[in-house]
Design a protein with these regions (language model features):
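Short, basic phosphate-binding NTP loop
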Residues: 1-8, 12-108, 129, 275, ...
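Phosphate-binding loop of NTP-binding sites
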Residues: 61-66, 73-233, 380, 417-427
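Residue-level signal for inorganic ion chemistry
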Residues: 21, 69, 109, 138, ...
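Short internal beta-strands
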Residues: 26-34, 189, 214-218, 320-324, ...
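Nucleotide phosphate-binding/pyrophosphate-handling subdomain across enzymes
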Residues: 20, 24, 246-342
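C-terminal helical cap/extension that packs against the catalytic core
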Residues: 43-49, 332-395
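Residues in the short beta-alpha loop(s) of Rossmann-like NAD(P)-binding domains
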Residues: 9, 34-36, 139, 220, ...
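Glycine/aspartate-rich loop-and-adjacent alpha/beta segment that forms the canonical ThDP
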Residues: 400-427
Length: 427
């Protein structure tokens, strides 16, 4: 099959799509309007695997050549080149066509805010209660990554899909309304100051209405009921479904609590499962707390400026920073503030580290150790810098500011490597 990846994506979402089809022996081309340099080094890896890369514009011949076009959600459905495509999908519509979908209870999470927290908390709680659960969508996990797991026999009981409102609408239009009937649809919040509640509900897209359970804010419940008609069996407000939530839990847990309650779990089960939720994986995730140190996984920091936002959270504490990785097209100067303030720096190996970070550190006479090929070596070095006699809380922080693909494939694998390395320290 000839597969065209239409739009590589600002966070290289096309990488997972391309790899999925390359691993199956398909012919793959990638087309993007950006220059080759701005796309990063992931495309070099894909090219070595057999993909053909066309940058700085699109060619009609690529669309005529293709049997299947995988469209980036950022590309409008009325794009002129799509008229030449035989078949068009995005990652979610392609996944929905798989027969395994009928074996999985899907929970869709959308809204203007709290999507990532709600999705991650639901995934954690369901797994904690013994129900195998995966998640994909907006948090950076492509549905093609999920399909790879299915191909290997790892089919979950539940799948959490985090969707932006425009992705939900895009997927609905792609499928011409024939979307799968999901177990639950969660609308976490609505846009501020909509003209009417009907408008707010409409913005969330009809994809959300084909569900056994719809859980939404009380302010749009009536509008959602009107829109859903007979498509949903049970529409509940977050507020009404979460009244028994433990007062020890933060208010942001009301959304996942309400969903789990409507799915039939007891209050005691839900409260216990959510109590152990430490935060969104790979985003300032607390991995370990000792008497005088915190180990934080911020592996989703894939651009230099993101490191500053994370380090600023701990500005009053000594931060032992683990950073670096792939993609030499990035400008390391954006994280110079954090490099200067760090109590110590342990570098992870990669093209960004070698070509950008190390020269910047040397230019500014900032000490560092590494680069380390293995995460456990970087974690071990950072931990050795902790002052065991200090009464001040210290932080060992993985915040790479770079792509993980050369050594880890994606930021989630990199985060797992960090967590495993930390767990080895306390054995």
């Amino acid at each position: 099959m000839n597969v065209l990846i239409f739009g590589y994506g600002l966070r290289a979402g096309g990488f997972d799509s391309a790899m999925y089809f390359l691993q199956r022996g398909d012919n793959v081309r990638i087309t993007d309007i950006r220059s080759r340099d701005s796309m990063g080094e992931g495309v070099d890896y894909l090219e070595k695997k057999g993909a053909v890369i066309h940058c700085s514009g699109h060619l009609t011949d690529d669309f005529l050549w293709s049997d299947l076009v995988i469209k980036s959600p950022s590309i409008r459905q009325d794009n002129e080149f799509l008229a030449f495509a035989k078949r068009i999908e995005n990652d979610l519509t392609y996944a929905s066509s798989r027969p395994e979908v009928s074996q999985v209870k899907i929970i869709c999470v959308t809204g203007s805010r709290y999507k990532a927290t709600t999705s991650s908390a639901l995934c954690h709680a369901l797994n904690e209660m013994g129900h195998r659960t995966h998640m994909c969508g907006n948090m950076g996990i492509s549905a093609f990554s999920e399909l790879q797991k299915w191909d290997e026999g790892d089919i979950p009981e539940y799948l959490i899909i985090e969707m932006s409102t425009w992705l939900a609408r895009d997927t609905y239009l792609f499928m011409k309304g024939n979307v799968p009937h999901v177990e639950a649809s969660v609308i976490t919040s609505v846009f501020e100051n909509p003209d009417t509640t009907e408008e707010a509900a409409n913005r969330l897209g009809e994809f959300n209405l084909h569900a056994n359970h719809i859980i939404c804010p009380a302010e749009v419940k009536d509008a959602i009921e009107k829109l859903a008609a007979k498509k949903a069996k049970n529409i509940s407000s977050i507020e009404a479904a979460s009244w028994a939530m433990s007062k020890a839990l933060p208010d942001k847990m009301r959304r996942p609590y309400a969903v789990l309650k409507k799915l039939g779990f007891s209050s005691s089960q839900i409260n216990a499962a959510l109590k152990s939720f430490k935060g969104i994986p790979n985003r300032c995730e607390l991995v370990l707390r000792t008497e005088n140190a915190m180990y934080i996984n911020d592996s989703s920091s894939v651009i230099p400026v993101a490191v500053n936002f994370t380090v600023d959270n701990y500005e009053s504490l000594p931060v032992h920073l683990i950073c670096g990785g792939s993609d030499s097209s990035l400008d390391a100067h954006a994280m110079l503030q954090s490099l200067r303030s760090a109590a110590s720096i342990s570098l992870l190996a990669g093209s960004f580290t070698q070509k950008k970070l190390i020269p910047l550190l040397r230019e500014n006479k900032i000490a560092f150790k590494g680069p380390y090929e293995k995460m456990e070596e970087a974690v071990r070095n950072a931990s050795s810098k902790l002052n065991s006699k200090s009464s001040i809380l210290q932080v060992v922080l993985l915040s790479p500011g770079a792509s993980p693909f050369e050594n880890y494939g994606n930021e989630f694998s990199r985060g797992e490597a960090f967590k495993q390395a930390v767990s080895q320290l306390v054995r």
